[in-house]
Every structure is written in structure tokens, then in C-alpha cells.
A protein has these predicted regions:
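AMP-forming adenylation/ATP pyrophosphatase catalytic core
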Residues: 2-42, 58-64, 93-95, 108, ...
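Core alpha/beta nucleotide-donor-binding catalytic domains of modification enzymes
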Residues: 2-192
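Enrichment for repetitive, rod-forming helical segments
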Residues: 113-116, 197, 219, 301
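Flexible helical/loop "lid" subdomain adjacent to adenine-nucleotide binding pockets
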Residues: 122-269, 277
Length: 308
């Protein structure tokens, strides 16, 4: 299961933090970065390791106002930032009413964060997301989510690592009670499905899921590169290439054209567009009121009526 490396306990706290930071692809020392910090162990560790890596970090806490005590969570982040010598600011947002609270809160949060914000996603988060996307019937990109890199520097670490960082620094992370609520599908994946998979496999499956995501990311990158040379509006060209490449070319065209607006361009939508390209139908609705129509062998993208 997920256990810290016993050998690291022989290191001093400073060396242990440095060793963990060295495993993370943070930007170069001296780079100014913004870290999204909720007050949980992962985001507090993100801030601490960014400072350890030499970044000039500012912690941004987003208060969604969804539960009592959110002001206290901001205080936890502010205190950690002071201890580390990082900047701090808190932003309050209003989460719109509607279904899928988790998605709406995420959308409200990212609307006020800079596009290059660093997040504290770990290998455990990535494994959960692979399984969640698989259950939604995702395509290849969804099976390779949360790619590691400077914006997600902790993807190579485990939750036990982020908890260890907090222990070393004396942080008491915020415990979000909603993380135990089985009404949220991610919680069931985290607390039920992954432990069951580990029991059946007789080993920790998080590294296996991450390894598969890495391999599929390489395939996805290649497909996107090949699809980039295709004219997705040409029905003849789409018919002449492997269907896997055609699917990627169509989806990239739709997304780059602005289709989505909070909706997912799923595999079924791509297949409907392929049917239009093949001549099985003249036009189809994609998602959110967007349509694709065929005329004289070419596909055209039509925005919702209110955007024309």
C-alpha cells in the first residue's frame, strides 16, 4: 500500500524537504509562481516545496463560502505562508446554483486563479481521475489526465509524501469533511474502489495507473501531432485517414473552434460528426447548441443561435 520510504527518516528535515522538492519539476529557482492553496495537506506541501525549490511563491486561497469555518481555512493558509516567507491573498467566490457541486466549485475557483497557477495534484489524484474518466466513457486524452510538469509539480509524489511535508513543518492541514461524503463519486473511488483494486491485485495500483497514463499520453501526443496535419473540414480527407486520427482531428477542431463552454465534447459527439463527414447525415448537434453541417464535401461549424 501507500507507505513513505523508511530511508528518508534518516535525513534531517531540511534535507528531506530538499529531496522531495528535487523530485518535482518546479520552475527554475527565482521564478515567481502562484500556488493554489486550500489548506489541505497537498496544497500546503505544494507551497512548502515551491519555496524549498527556490521559487518566489504566493499562496492564493479561494473561499467558496460553501461551509462554515471557511475563514478559518484562509487563516491556516495565511499562517503557513508567513512561516515559509511566501506571499498570501484570499479571494471569495460565489458558486452558482446547479447540479454537480464539485464541478461548479472548480469552475468558479479557476475563474479567479491565473492561468499558470500551480496546483497540488498528486499521483493519487491522477489515479483517481483515470478511473473516474474511464467510468464516464472517456477517450484517449481522458485516460492520460493531469500530466506532470511545472504546473502540476507534485504528480510524481504520493499523498503520504505531502502529509510528511506537513509533519516536518508542523502544519495542521485543513480536514475537509466533504472528502468522506460518498455522494461524491471521487470519494468512492478514493475510499472504496482503489482499496478494493489494491486488495484484488495484491499490490498498490496507483503507480500502475500512473504508468499507464504516461504510456497513453505518449500515444495521445503522437495522434494529436498527426491529426494536426489534417484538414478536419474536408470530408474526403477525413475518409482517407485512419479513423483514430480522424476522431482526434475532429475533436481538436471542435474544441479549438470554441465548442464546449463548460460541456464535454464526448466520444458520441465526435462519432456524430464523423457520420456527417461520411454522408450518413447532413448535420448534427454537437453539444451546447453547437452544430456541424456538411455542404459540398466540407464541414462547417455553427455556433448556438444566441452567438450568431
Amino acid at each position: 500500500m501507500d507507505h513513505p520510504d523508511p530511508s528518508r527518516r534518516r535525513l534531517t528535515p531540511g534535507l528531506e524537504l530538499a529531496a522531495l522538492a528535487a523530485r518535482c519539476p518546479f520552475p527554475a529557482s527565482g521564478t515567481a509562481v502562484t500556488c493554489a492553496v486550500s489548506g489541505g495537506a497537498d496544497s500546503l506541501a505544494l507551497l512548502a516545496l515551491a519555496i524549498t525549490a527556490g521559487c518566489v511563491a504566493t499562496a492564493v486561497h479561494v473561499d467558496h463560502g460553501l461551509r462554515p469555518g471557511s475563514d478559518d481555512e484562509a487563516d491556516v493558509v495565511a499562517a503557513a505562508a508567513r512561516q515559509l516567507g511566501a506571499g498570501f491573498r484570499s479571494v471569495a467566490v460565489t458558486v452558482p446554483v446547479g447540479p454537480n457541486l464539485e464541478a461548479r466549485a472548480r469552475q468558479a475557483r479557476y475563474a479567479v486563479l491565473p492561468p499558470d497557477v500551480l496546483t497540488g495534484h498528486t499521483a493519487d489524484d491522477r489515479a483517481e481521475t483515470v478511473l473516474l474518466n474511464m467510468m464516464r466513457g472517456t477517450g484517449l486524452d481522458g485516460l492520460a489526465p493531469l500530466a506532470p510538469g511545472p504546473r502540476r509539480p507534485l504528480v510524481g509524489l504520493r499523498r503520504s509524501d505531502t502529509e510528511r511535508v506537513c509533519d516536518l513543518l508542523g502544519f495542521e492541514p485543513v480536514q475537509d469533511p466533504s472528502n468522506l461524503d460518498p455522494v461524491h463519486r471521487r470519494n468512492r473511488v478514493r475510499n472504496e474502489l482503489l482499496p478494493l483494486a489494491a486488495d484484488v491485485a495484491g499490490r498498490d495500483v496507483v503507480p500502475l495507473l500512473n504508468r499507464q497514463a504516461d504510456l497513453l499520453a505518449e500515444v495521445a501526443d503522437w495522434l494529436h501531432e498527426v491529426a494536426g496535419a489534417v484538414d478536419p473540414t474536408s470530408a474526403r480527407e477525413l475518409a482517407a485517414i485512419p479513423v483514430a486520427v480522424a476522431r482526434v482531428a475532429i475533436r481538436d477542431w471542435l474544441v479549438q473552434g470554441g465548442v464546449g463552454g463548460g460541456y464535454v465534447v464526448d466520444a458520441a459527439a465526435v462519432e456524430r460528426v464523423l457520420d456527417v463527414a461520411r454522408g450518413s447525415s447532413v448535420a448534427t448537434e454537437v453539444v451546447g447548441g453547437w452544430r456541424v453541417a456538411r455542404s459540398r464535401g466540407r464541414l462547417g461549424l455553427q455556433p448556438p443561435s444566441g452567438q450568431r
